[in-house]
Design a protein with these regions (language model features):
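Catalytic alpha/beta core of large soluble enzyme barrels
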Residues: 1, 6-8, 59, 66-239
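A generic structural signal for well-ordered coil/turn residues at beta-strand boundaries
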Residues: 50-51, 61, 157-159, 247
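Short acidic, low-complexity intrinsically disordered linear motifs used
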Residues: 238-254
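Internal maturation/activation junctions in enzymes
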Residues: 1, 16-59
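Short capping micro-motif at the N-terminus of alpha-helices
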Residues: 52, 65-66
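Residue microenvironments linked to proteolytic maturation
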Residues: 13
Length: 254
């Protein structure tokens, strides 16, 4: 709280970065300057101190799903993906999705929740063909270069990115960090998973994201029925319980 009173930091972020390879240093600086001037003008109008920093780049996992775009600065795992998403057991979407033909399985945590398979495709992102799949084989250095581009031209705080790498790339990563240390604040590193392996191959009941072939993706999408969103909204409203247990202003989790 004290830091916020002193710094007045903003968090104006970007998402879907890999879908816009046309955005170079000039365009990113225009975006940064627009965000800064907007924040400064609002601070001046409200009689508040101007923020120390305005722009950042967050993980953007949840909001990107709402926007139907790629997450922050990250490149997707593959062109065609089955996203296995957890829904709580009383979510009104569950029966609607079941009737529409979506694959639904009980969550292995045993709480009564559900795991529902949602198909996702990225037709405007470049991938490498490996067998029947089109997957992300981007090198660690390419990911770090994207981080540097954003840090140099848009970000004032830090760019959140998890760099997937192979052990054979460690020497190149160290060399890059030493060369560009002044451009670097901090990133996460994660050993690259083999996109060709399934949940069964890895000993898990399911994977949060499973790369699939175009044929498998198309077959699943073709099996799905349209969803009546008005019905979903009505069921969501009906699901609100305003009984005595809600009298204190907070309803219990169902």
């Amino acid at each position: 709280h004290e830091n916020n009173d002193f710094l007045h930091l903003c968090g104006v972020s970007l998402t879907g970065v890999v879908r816009r390879p046309d955005l170079g240093p000039y365009e990113l600086r225009l975006l940064r300057n627009a965000a800064i001037m907007g924040a400064y003008s609002m601070a001046d109008e409200l009689g508040l101190p101007r923020p120390k920093n305005v722009t950042t780049l967050k993980p953007e996992g949840t909001i990107s799903k709402c926007y139907d775009t790629t997450e922050g600065a990250h490149k997707p795992l593959a062109r065609h993906i089955f996203n296995n998403v957890t829904f709580v057991k009383h979510d009104p979407l569950v029966p609607v999705l079941r009737e529409a033909g979506y694959k639904i399985m009980p969550h292995p945590n045993g709480t009564g929740d559900w795991v529902i398979t949602l198909p996702v495709a990225w037709d405007d992102v470049d991938f490498e063909k490996v067998g029947d799949l089109e997957v992300n084989e981007e090198t660690a250095i390419d990911q770090l270069e994207r981080y540097k581009l954003l840090m140099d031209n848009y970000v004032e705080q830090n760019c959140s990115i998890t760099v997937s790498y192979d052990p054979s790339e460690v020497d190149a990563i160290v060399e890059w960090l030493l060369q560009y240390w002044d451009h670097y604040v901090g990133v996460s590193f994660l050993l690259r998973a083999d996109p060709l392996k399934t949940a069964a191959d890895l000993g898990f009941p399911y994977l949060p994201q499973q790369p699939v072939s175009k044929a498998e993706y198309d077959a699943y999408v073709a099996s799905l029925k349209p969803i009546d969103l008005e019905r979903v909204q009505a069921q969501s409203e009906d699901a609100v319980d305003m009984g005595n247990e809600c009298a204190g202003g907070a309803c219990p989790i169902r």
